[in-house]
């Protein structure tokens, strides 16, 4: 129970955060301020983040947008997309609200997806667009 984090693939281009059962905003802050920057600092290339809320009990929604904004603004320059997976209607509403309120590089890089498979496809769209720009 809580939050676990691991590399989703051997290439270290995607980090999977799994929110399972109960967790706290303190757990979230530890993850986003310590663990995530360390992992993302291991590699020079773009890293996408899949945050799986499928089996999560969300703590109080008070301050959720502020917590998310501070977390994302602290990620390294190699941060690609954040894709929130399997969230309930409240989580999906918060993702959409976040995208509208922070309509800049942070909001434009944040998405919701119903499954990990769809989230992976969204991450690959970023990579395809980046490759096309590099050619």
Task: Show the residue positions of the predicted features.
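Amphipathic, Lys/Arg-enriched alpha-helical "gate/interface" segment within cytosolic domains
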Residues: 1-135
């Amino acid at each position: 129970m809580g939050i676990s984090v691991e590399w989703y693939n051997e290439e270290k281009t995607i980090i999977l955060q799994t929110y399972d059962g109960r967790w706290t905003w303190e757990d979230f802050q530890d993850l986003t301020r310590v663990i995530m920057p360390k992992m993302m600092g291991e590699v020079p290339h773009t890293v996408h983040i899949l945050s799986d809320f499928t089996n999560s009990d969300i703590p109080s929604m008070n301050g959720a947008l502020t917590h998310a904004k501070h977390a994302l603004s602290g990620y390294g320059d190699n941060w690609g997309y954040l894709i929130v997976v399997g969230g309930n209607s409240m989580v999906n509403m918060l993702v959409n609200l976040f995208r509208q309120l922070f309509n800049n590089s942070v909001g434009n890089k944040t998405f919701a997806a119903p499954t990990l498979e769809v989230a992976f496809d969204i991450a690959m769209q970023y990579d395809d667009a980046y490759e096309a720009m590099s050619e």
